[in-house]
Amino acid sequence: MKVFNLNEDIKFENQERILIKTGSDKNLLQLARKDKDLKAKYKELLANDYILYFHDKETSRFCKREHVNKLFNGLNLVQYKNVFYRLSQPQGRKVNDKVSKKLIVIFAKMPGAQQYDSPKIPHRMLPPFFDDLERSLVKNVYTMRIMDTNVSHGSHYINTTNYPDYEQEIQESIENVRKNLDIEKENVVFYGVSRGGAGAIYHGTALDYKTLAVDPILNIGGKLEANDRRILKGLRINDLVPTVNLNVANSNKYQKVIICSENVPLYYEQSMRINNEKIKVLNMKDDKITSHPEVSPNTVPEQLMILNNLLSGISV
């Protein structure tokens, strides 16, 4: 298998794997952060539908997205077309056959700082999040956790130039799970934080499902571009707000909630553009919240209250 050097033009021939010799312990993604030419090379790989999956012996390894399933042995992932997810069922005391089956669909959050630029796909695209969530939910809840398997750090579950059918396949995968489990639409909730919040509110409004989105990344352009930190510029649309507002104008039978905070003005400004006559937007005033990553951990009780309300239909 040919190994390309950093200064060498990559010859794209639809090959399954592409190897890049970085000459460093750092992977190409890490190097791209500080070098615009390497960033352009990295984005060229993304645009041609390659995903970084490993770095060893000073070599970064990329795999064509349609073949990444070969890398996921032992990860307990279910594949629907090119969408990957984990599905768990209620266990032990969380089973109650006297109430309807329910489904929570979780869209992955962004990885933490230590794994943000990890060469491993699961670290970037399905990082651990609220692994014991089911313990705090009503009974009979199935959980579907969707990996954001696209480009560098996922595309926040949005179509990209290299994957124009992504949204459709995500929505089909959810409908497939719901129908196979024989769960009524009214017993399904979409949920996500940050990147996952964007996915939840985008697809939740597209399909009209109950939704909780926590400080969603609704726009990656303008003041939120941040030197293309998410490595998505030019690969997908920037602003999701017009589509979300159009979706709820067309159909909005089921309740949708966004949690945000005025203490994080860049994200708050975007949430304030949402049609709050159709979607409930909650501004959490809390001095403990000083940045985007702090919104979710400081609103866990509120999130659980809303999720259980949406799942059970019980409100006081």
Predicted regions: what is each one?
Residues 298-316:
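Catalytic active-site module of serine/aspartate enzymes centered on a nucleophile-bearing elbow/loop
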Residues 213-223:
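Active-site nucleophile loop of the alpha/beta-hydrolase fold
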Residues 192-204:
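Glycine-rich nucleophile elbow surrounding the catalytic serine of serine-hydrolase chemistry
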Residues 222-294, 309-313:
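The feature captures the conserved acid-bearing segment of alpha/beta-hydrolase catalytic domains
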Residues 77-141, 145, 149-153:
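Short, surface-exposed "cap/lid" segments of acyl-processing enzymes
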Residues 157-181:
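Alpha/beta-hydrolase active-site loop
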